[in-house]
């Protein structure tokens, strides 16, 4: 007799292998036809708002793994919030203006951009940016990101530019924006100012020099002995800045010494705290201290410049430290922020002896026309020959480089537009207190950056950017930015785009009949600089979020760590400065960088990059999503083919668990779940464990701890289900009567588990969970179209076991672990084959073990151990039994012998009361109900 056909061995249409690269595009098509994003909004309309504001990626290249990580995390946020009952508008955006696009256009098309009409060049930049918006959008869609792809915001869009102009106008009106000559980061390769967020530091070798500035005028303060052959010794790592030296700064309260070099009769002024180090570097071994004075004593003395016909003034500054150098600080106001402020305090004129191209001007004398890096060895040689060089060293130091061209930059004073952050620093820091920061240290980092930052340089000497909406009166020369001009420019930009600024003359752009508010003049010219791209991204909360989406502030911003000095900060500053409000976000979350499998930065030159498109083709987008969802994203996230292979194995465990459930639910109607009172205790144990999973995952989603969700689901599948519960209930599912209460109890638990597990993992494993959802039987209240259109399952409180009952079950499973160990020994000794061939006898040697056996008396131990018989009251182990002590319970003795009775040909359980066909009572009853005909 073939009994297989009498078993409940059903098969669903859910394949064991995912085939994700082939299957996912069809699912994307289904989502598109469903209009999933808008359906999600309709589902939760009128419910509490969860607004994730998309910090815009830059539209200058294809998708990379950093993009993938960022967008996966955002999609997890949106999907999980929607499934927790929130209304979740999500408008994707792109940052379009800036030097990287200009550079790419020039290189790609070999353009002479300086000879091109500006509107024509800007149009080429626009097309380039739009191309990569399209490329990136397709990549994000392939990743499964649910968003309003039909209506993204773009910082180059006329509507956006019109609103950004208003942000500038509001800050100008409050007096926060001004034009001044101040040192800024300057890339002379690209001929533009840079923001702090556009700077990358690299270790560069350099020659550091100690230079003698001979005394010129001591203001009658020094004795003849002190001033004889006296020089002030300065130290610098930037030789090329020496032509710009105007002063030497000393700390007013530190002790300075005049040191006599007995080897050559020279005398040097250095800080006493640094004297030994300086003398050692200079090779001066025989020296004495002539005198000591506080730094303030030397104020306003004059020194001769070492190679130019001019003098340098001795000034005082609190920032002069005794950590390095000589205590006498080379001060060139055109090349340093502190230098600039100090010289300004002393009423000195600004000197900037380097032009936009990084070449020395005529002010530098014989070095005029040289690039700064070319002049270093020449100046060094000249100082050596003139006897001005006290010492030199070769060191490696961290030096700023341009984020785009990767070349060293300089600090250089140029006329720029600035935002006076000092005016509202306190308000910006106070706004941070109302934000939830994840990680928690984010608030300290942000506040420190705001407090320490200089005024924000918001102008760029570039063409592809939003024009700074300022006019200049040709008669009085004053800059003009009024409510009237801002309103007119905003209207023009909104209608025609910002190219109109370069297509029309100033007189055509100002309001009709407009006159200079200072002198009444009627003729104007336009500002030629454009706005910093960070001003663009810092305006998105107003230009997109508030205007187009109708809410403010956002629930959350999520971006990379670099955005503390980038988008997070610029958004905070514009919100406080322009709008007079608090932070534009209630929560601020950061993620780390994506790095290779060894933790190294990914670069094309190193060949260690991972292309998301390759991941999609080889593994599928869900594996990429699982990578993002399994990572501690607050630190750097490793990425490699080996990692994706391992994740694919983890994925298969989840998929196989789902397949097991689906295969055993093909004949189940979840509208008729087994009631709690009627459900088998083992099934209620599984539901209680499910409840624990749901509580843990709900808390994790609230804190955006997706790693916790992924690990919890994986552990639940592997530990609770696959290796325990699912293994135990196979007999009930396959062999009990199809409609029996015991089987329906197991099916009810299976459905509850699969339903909840699919929903709780759906924000992360979007494609696979939806595939499962489409295969599942559903209740009447479910939305069968897509899993994300349903709410997360709440814990099944009515089905939960008590704490005492759960303790008893945990005891049973600890006993099971000990029994399994002995079963393995018996199997290895060939005493038994399958575990169903075993009879297990348990013996307690101590009170704790006796109590454990007493606690599990109500539990069906043969079912739990998957054996035919279990006894706890035998006097001694059977003859020939395999006997071992327990591990979980050292006081336990486990004896395994051959099962008593006859092996049932249908379920393979051994029975001492078989029928005439050898069937156990359970299988005999099932076959009778099925009207099985025995031949």
Name the predicted role of every residue range.
Residues 215, 346-358, 462-464, 486-636:
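Alpha-helical recognition segments enriched in aromatics with Gly/Pro capping
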Residues 2-20, 26, 30-34, 106-243, ...:
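Residue patterns forming the tRNA-binding/recognition surfaces of aminoacyl-tRNA synthetases
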Residues 187, 402, 473, 516-519, ...:
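Short cysteine-rich clusters marking metal-coordination/redox-active sites
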Residues 191, 461, 477, 520, ...:
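Cys/His-coordinated zinc-binding microdomains
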Residues 42-103, 234-241, 315-342, 346, ...:
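N-terminal catalytic cores of NTP/NDP-binding nucleotidyl/phosphoryl-transfer enzymes
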């Amino acid at each position: 007799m073939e009994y297989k056909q009498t078993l409940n061995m059903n098969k669903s249409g859910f394949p064991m292998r995912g085939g994700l690269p082939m299957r996912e595009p069809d699912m994307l098509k289904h989502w598109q036809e469903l209009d999933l994003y808008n359906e999600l909004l309709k589902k939760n309309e009128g419910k509490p708002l969860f607004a994730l504001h998309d910090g815009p990626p830059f539209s200058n290249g294809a998708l990379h793994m950093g993009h993938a990580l960022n967008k996966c995390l955002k999609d997890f946020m949106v999907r999980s919030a929607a499934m927790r009952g929130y209304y979740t508008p999500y408008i994707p955006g792109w940052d379009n203006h800036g030097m990287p696009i200009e550079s790419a256009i020039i290189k790609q098309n070999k353009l002479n951009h300086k000879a091109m009409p500006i509107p024509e060049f800007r149009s080429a930049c626009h097309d380039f940016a739009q191309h990569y918006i399209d490329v990136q959008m397709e990549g994000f869609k392939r990743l499964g990101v649910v968003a309003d792809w039909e209506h993204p915001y773009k910082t180059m869009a006329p509507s956006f530019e019109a609103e950004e102009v208003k942000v500038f106008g509001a800050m100008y009106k409050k007096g926060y924006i001004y034009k001044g000559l101040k040192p800024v980061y300057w890339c002379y390769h690209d001929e533009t100012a840079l923001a702090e967020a556009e700077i990358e530091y690299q270790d560069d070798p350099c020659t550091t020099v100690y230079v003698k500035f001979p005394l010129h005028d001591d203001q009658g303060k020094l004795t003849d002995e002190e001033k004889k052959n006296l020089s002030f010794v300065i130290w610098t790592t930037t030789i090329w800045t020496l032509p710009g030296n105007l002063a030497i700064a000393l700390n007013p309260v530190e002790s300075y010494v005049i040191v006599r070099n007995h080897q050559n009769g020279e005398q040097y002024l250095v800080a006493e705290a640094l004297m030994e180090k300086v003398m050692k570097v200079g090779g001066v071994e025989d020296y004495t201290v002539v005198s000591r004075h506080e730094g303030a004593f030397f104020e306003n003395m004059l020194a001769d410049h070492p190679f130019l016909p001019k003098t340098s003034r001795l000034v005082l500054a609190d920032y002069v430290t005794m950590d390095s150098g000589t205590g006498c600080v080379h001060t060139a106001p055109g090349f340093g922020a502190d230098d600039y402020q100090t010289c300004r305090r002393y009423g000195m004129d600004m000197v900037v002896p380097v032009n936009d191209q990084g070449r020395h001007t005529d002010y530098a004398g014989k070095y005029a026309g040289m690039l700064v890096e070319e002049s270093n060895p020449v100046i060094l040689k000249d100082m050596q020959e003139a006897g001005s060089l006290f010492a030199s060293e070769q060191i490696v130091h961290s030096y700023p480089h341009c984020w785009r061209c990767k070349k060293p930059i300089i600090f250089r004073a140029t006329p720029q537009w600035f935002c006076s952050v000092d005016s509202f620093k306190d308000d910006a820091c106070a706004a941070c207190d109302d934000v939830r920061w994840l990680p928690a240290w984010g608030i300290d980092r942000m506040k420190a950056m705001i407090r320490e930052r200089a005024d924000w340089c918001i102008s760029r000497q570039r063409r592809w950017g939003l024009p700074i909406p300022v006019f200049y009166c040709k008669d009085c020369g004053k800059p003009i930015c009024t409510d009237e001009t801002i309103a007119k420019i905003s209207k023009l930009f909104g209608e025609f785009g910002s190219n109109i600024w370069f297509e029309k003359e100033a007189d055509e752009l100002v309001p009709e009949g407009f006159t200079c508010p200072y002198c009444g003049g009627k003729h104007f010219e336009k500002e030629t600089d454009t706005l910093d791209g960070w001003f663009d991204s810092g305006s998105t909360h107003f230009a997109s979020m508030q205007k187009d989406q109708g809410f403010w502030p956002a629930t959350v911003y999520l971006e990379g760590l670099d955005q503390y000095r980038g988008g997070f900060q610029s958004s905070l500053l514009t919100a406080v400065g322009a709008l007079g409000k608090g932070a534009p976000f209630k929560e601020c979350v950061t993620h780390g960088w994506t790095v290779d499998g060894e933790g190294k930065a990914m670069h094309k030159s190193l060949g260690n990059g991972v292309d998301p498109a390759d991941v999609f083709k080889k593994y599928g987008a869900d594996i990429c999503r699982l990578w993002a969802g399994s990572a501690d994203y607050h630190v750097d996230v490793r990425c490699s083919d080996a990692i994706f292979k391992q994740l694919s194995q983890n994925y298969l465990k989840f998929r196989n668990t789902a397949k097991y459930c689906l295969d055993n639910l093909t004949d189940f109607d979840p509208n008729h779940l087994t009631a709690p009172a009627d459900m088998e205790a083992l099934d209620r144990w599984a539901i209680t464990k499910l409840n624990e999973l749901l509580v843990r995952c709900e808390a994790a989603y609230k804190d955006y701890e997706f790693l916790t969700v992924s690990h919890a689901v994986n552990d639940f599948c592997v530990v609770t289900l696959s290796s325990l519960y699912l293994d135990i209930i196979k007999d009930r599912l396959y062999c009990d009567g199809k409609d029996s209460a015991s089987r329906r109890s197991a099916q009810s638990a299976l459905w509850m588990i699969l339903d909840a597990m699919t929903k709780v993992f759906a924000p992360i494993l979007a494609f696979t969970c939806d595939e499962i959802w489409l295969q599942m039987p559903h209740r009447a209240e479910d939305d069968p179209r897509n899993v994300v259109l349903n709410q997360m399952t709440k814990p099944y409180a009515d089905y939960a076991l008590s704490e005492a009952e759960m303790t008893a079950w945990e005891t049973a499973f600890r006993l099971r672990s000990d029994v399994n160990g002995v079963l393995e020994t018996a199997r290895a000794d060939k005493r038994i084959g399958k575990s169903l061939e075993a009879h297990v006898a348990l013996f307690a040697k101590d009170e704790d073990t006796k109590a454990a056996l007493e606690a599990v008396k109500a539990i069906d131990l043969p079912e739990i151990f998957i054996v035919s018989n279990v006894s706890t009251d035998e006097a001694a182990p059977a003859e020939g039994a395999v006997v071992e002590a327990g591990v979980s319970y050292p006081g336990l003795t486990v004896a395994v012998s051959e099962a008593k009775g006859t092996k049932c040909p249908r379920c393979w359980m051994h029975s001492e009361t078989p029928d005439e066909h050898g069937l156990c009572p359970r299988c005999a009853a099932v076959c009778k109900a099925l009207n099985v005909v025995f031949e």
